[in-house]
Amino acid sequence: MERMRTTYFVGGRLVDGTGEKAVENAVLAVREGKILYAGAAEGAPEPAVEDLAVDVSGLTLLPGLFNCHAHLDLNLPYKDYKVDEFGPAYRAMVSYRRAAEALVNGVTTVRCVGMDGGADYAVKKAVEKGMLMGPRVLAAGPIIIATGGHGNNDPGSMECSGAAEFRRAARNELKKGADLIKIGLSGGLASPHEGIADKQMMDDEIRAVVEVAHGAGKKVAAHLGGDGPIRDAVRLGVDSVEHAYFMDKETAAMMAEAGTYLVPTLCVSSANEYLMAHGSPAYQLEKLALAQKAHKDSIRNGVRAGVTICCGTDLLPSDPFEGTTATIREVELFTEVGLSPLEAIRAATRNSAELCGVLAETGTLEAGKAADVIAVSGKPDERIGDLRNLRMVMKGGSLVRAELPGLKADFNPAGMDGELSGGTFITW
C-alpha cells in the first residue's frame, strides 16, 4: 500500500495549548488529518522524499480556537415577541454561513448554546457527514427557560413550568442528539422585563434538568447573570456558568471547589458600539452600562479563585469587533482580567476542549489528535494581540485558510474572497 504523504511545518514556534512555554524551532507533522509529531526539531522524525516541508519561520503554530458560547442564527437588533425573520430552512443556511466564517477565522470548534428550528443540529450533521466543510459543532438545541423567562422573545425558546416540563424538554433535546443542555436560570441583558440577577428557575426545575443530562453523560450550561443564581447552579450540579456579570469572591471560590467551568463572554459587556451599530434598544444599553465594570471584576474573582476559564462570545464567532473578530477579541480580553497570554490561549483551546468533552480528540497540539491548527505571525504567547495576524487555518488536516507560500486552501466559500468576517453586519 502506498504511504500517505506527511506535511512538515518547520522553522517556526509551537504553542501546544497545554500551558507549557513555546517550543522554538519546532516541527509539526501532519498525516491523514492527524498530528504525527509536535515538538522540538531535534526529536522530529525524518521526512521521506515524497513528504512536503512548509517553512513557517516567523510564525507560531497553535491549536485551533474554540468558541463555547455561540448562537449562529443571531439576528440583531432583537425584535418583538417571537418574531421569526428566517424560518427554519433558511435559518440553517444562515447558520452554516456563520459557521464557515468562524472556521476561516481560526475557530475550529463551536459550541452552540441556544438556536432555533434545529439549525445547530442541521449544521452539525452536515459537517460530521462530510456534506459541508465547517468547524466541529456541539449542539444544544433551543435554550430551555421558565415561562416568561430570559429569551422568551426568541421564536425557538422552550418555555417550561415545573420540574416535569423541564425534564421532558431536556429529554426531547437528548432525543434529537443534543451534545449538552442549555438552560436560562437567571435574567440577562437582552430582555426588557427582568433584572440581570433575577432567579427564574426553581431548584427542583434545575435539579430535574441536571439529572436528565448527567444521566445521559451530557453537561448542562446555564445562562447566569447574578451571584445568588450562580451559587444555586453550582450547588445543584450545573457544569458551566455562562456570563457571570455579578459574582463575588465567595461564589468564585465555590465554583473553583466544585470544578464548575466559566464562560465569561466578556465581549458582551464591551459591546456598546457593536450594539449601537445594530440599533439595539435603549434598555439593553442601560443594562449594559450597569454590567460593564462589574463583569470584569467578577471574572477577576474567578481567575484569582482558580476557576477554569473557557472561551465564548455570545456574539457570532466571526463578528467584526474592535478591530478583529469577536473570538480573538475575547481571548485578548482574558489578559485584562488576570490571565497571562499563555493562560488565555489555554482557555481558548485546552480548557474549552475539556468543557466540550473533546479533549481526547483536539484542543492541544499533541501526537494522535486531530490536526486542528492555526498559524499566526509573531508571538501571541507573549503579545496576545498577535493572534490577529492569522496566516493559516487547518481543520482535521484540511487547509481552510492559507496565506503562506506554496499552500492553497481546500475551502473557498462563496463571497469570502475579500471580506472573511461579515458576521451579523451582513444582512442575510
Residue ranges of predicted features:
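Active-site gating loops and adjacent loop-to-helix segments of metal-dependent hydrolytic enzymes
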Residues: 72-91, 100-103, 133, 141, ...
